[in-house]
Amino acid sequence: MDFQISAQQREMVASVRSLAQTEFKPNAMRWMDGTFPWENMKKLADLGVLGMSVPEEYGGLGLPILDTALILEEIAKVDYVTAMAVLGEAGVQTRVIARYAPASIRERILPQVVSGDCILAVCMTEPHAGTDVANYRTNARIVGDRVILKGTKTLISRAPEAGMFVVFTRVDGKPGREGIGCVLLEAGTPGFAVTGTYHTMGGENLHEIQFDDCELPLENLVIREDGFRKLLTAFNTQRCLNPSISLGLAEGAFDEAVNYVRERTIFNKPISDFQGIRWKLADMFKDIEAARGLLYRACLTANPFPDPFMAAAAKIFCN
């Protein structure tokens, strides 16, 4: 398998690296209170980064998963909160809309994703079920040409900022995995509310949201049949992109460690001269490179979604 990074990939990564190192890194702590990094997202939109997963016909770059992972990795080296915000625009929710939504929704929403005017949120976790989709209670009831959505989702990223929510739900109360589908809900829909906020150690805020008989057009039910398989297939993308952020965090920590051991002195010499310290750095480097190889290999299996076994292995090791 060829892990060579192309000149085009290097150029894009270099542009993002320059922006991240000069503008994101000095201000990364600003977002640790849960504030959404709108300022950074606008700059990334100007570079085209928010359209990485959007097909070219809607103004995006249509990048392969490896390219997307490389860019997320670069941002995460210096700014975890911004990297997670970008993941929301490049991950499973964008790909569900691009692949399964009707043309009318794709044509309206995807260009706004590219420009940064529409933030996306994926809604999976429920208070009693976690991500165990077979036990979802949120339900989309079909009534004529409308869909009535009722239920609760929790630990949702970007809920106050999002313009559209990709909601995995039961359809017409059908039990088990076979009853899982997906609806698209726009912010401001009557009956929708953000009802709780949980601040995390990483700086992100996560939220609980309620759907109280939200009425939607039937075309917003974008996955009705075989939703569980389609969900897991699409989610394998997330299992590659999320680890790319973990890899970036590890690289950022390694860079800081190397700089520190060169500057910190004991007995009039830098601690980098001590063999015990070098062993620690060698172990860090080894783990980072092993993670990189596993992750890049998983990304390269995408057609259009990554191999589930490789994606799972990469996520376990990197995270």
Residue ranges of predicted features:
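Alpha-helical interface subdomain recognition
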Residues: 1-79, 88, 100-105, 112-117, ...
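Flexible, glycine-rich active-site loops centered on histidine and acidic residues
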Residues: 94-100, 122, 134
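A short, Trp-centered hydrophobic/proline-enriched beta-strand micro-motif
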Residues: 116-124
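Active-site-adjacent elements of ketosynthase-type condensing enzymes
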Residues: 128-136
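A short core secondary-structure module
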Residues: 146-193
